[in-house]
């Protein structure tokens, strides 16, 4: 069965990279190859290097990209290893970098992966299925304080203490639907009627399992060092906490180093642009509604 995944903010992301036919481009979250395939179509003598810690994504994108060309390399790795992995290819600078921080549709839709709170499966949520830490371990062994911390820090979960307490009391919890019911049991009916709390709690557990925020911060530093002059780093985010990491990192780079009242003209090193999905894209793909594309371009 073919895995359907619609790349989000595709046109805006590709345009922002200003692709040169002989350039070197990175897709640090190759996924199902939606964005990567459009990059590869524009490369004549250039090279696309794609990263993903999900081996299934690597295999699926390879099939898709092979139909377009052969000038690509796929690396099964977390993007926080990007500099080391590129060094193995003797690459120390690139012409553009794309990062899509969203979880892909096939990952959500495949019940066995344990990401979905509406489909029953063993608690898993690992992007890299070779790693030991999974959602089952987090849910069944973390202390109440540890659970409260990840719920609040990674998803701003309302009633985080009550949810953590409910999880502790109902252990062992083995499946996604069991966890969903436990989460709901911590909320009064009035709050449940307004919003399903499972989305935020599952998000927090997924971020913990995959060490996502730490990886993002490491990746940002490495990506910045890899950019050539006049090249761009384009990052698509899907929730406010994730986006705030990117916004803060980019903001610090473009912020003036001098007091505002000092009449010193600074040479701009970077510019930042922000894009949101069009109404048309949102109507065609509801998953795009919370997406945001931030693009940092290195000027000197």
From Swiss-Prot:
Disulfide bond residue pairs: none
Highest taxon above the source species: Bacteria
Pfam families recorded: Methyltransf_5
GO molecular function, a single term: rRNA (cytosine-N4-)-methyltransferase activity
Primary localisation category: cytoplasm
Assigned EC number: 2.1.1.199
Xref: InterPro entries: RsmH, SAM-dep_MeTrfase_MraW_recog, SAM-dependent_MTases_sf
Subcellular location: Cytoplasm
GO BP, sorted A to Z: rRNA base methylation
Gene Ontology cellular-component terms listed: cytoplasm
Role, per record: Specifically methylates the N4 position of cytidine in position 1402 (C1402) of 16S rRNA.
HAMAP family documented for this protein: 16SrRNA_methyltr_H (MF_01007)
Protein's name in the database: Ribosomal RNA small subunit methyltransferase H
């Amino acid at each position: 069965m073919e895995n359907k995944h619609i790349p989000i903010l595709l046109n805006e992301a590709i345009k922002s990279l200003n692709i040169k036919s002989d350039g070197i481009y990175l897709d640090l979250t190759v996924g199902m190859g939606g964005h990567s395939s459009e990059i590869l179509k524009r490369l004549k003598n250039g090279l696309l290097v794609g990263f993903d810690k999900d081996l299934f994504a690597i295999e699926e994108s390879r099939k898709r990209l092979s139909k377009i060309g052969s000038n690509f390399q796929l690396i099964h790795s977390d993007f926080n290893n990007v500099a080391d992995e590129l060094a193995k290819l003797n690459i120390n600078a690139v012409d553009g970098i794309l990062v899509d921080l969203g979880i892909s549709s096939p990952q959500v839709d495949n019940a066995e992966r344990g990401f979905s709170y509406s489909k029953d499966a063993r608690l898993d949520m690992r992007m890299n299925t070779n790693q030991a830490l999974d959602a089952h371990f987090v849910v069944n062994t973390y202390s109440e304080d540890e659970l409260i911390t990840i719920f609040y820090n990674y998803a701003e979960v309302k009633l985080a203490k009550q949810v953590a307490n409910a999880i502790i009391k109902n252990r062992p919890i083995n499946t996604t639907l069991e966890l969903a019911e436990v989460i709901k049991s911590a909320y009064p009916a009035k709050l449940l009627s307004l919003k399903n709390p499972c989305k935020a709690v599952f998000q927090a557990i997924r971020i913990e399992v995959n060490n996502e925020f730490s990886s993002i911060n490491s990746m940002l530093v490495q990506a910045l060092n890899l950019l050539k002059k006049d090249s761009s780093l384009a990052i698509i985010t899907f929730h406010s906490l994730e986006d705030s990491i990117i916004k803060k990192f980019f903001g610090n780079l473009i912020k003036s180093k001098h007091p505002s009242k000092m009449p010193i003209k600074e040479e701009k090193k970077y510019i930042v642009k922000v894009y949101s999905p069009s109404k048309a894209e949102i109507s065609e793909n509801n998953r795009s509604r919370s997406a945001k594309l931030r693009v940092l371009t290195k000027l000197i």
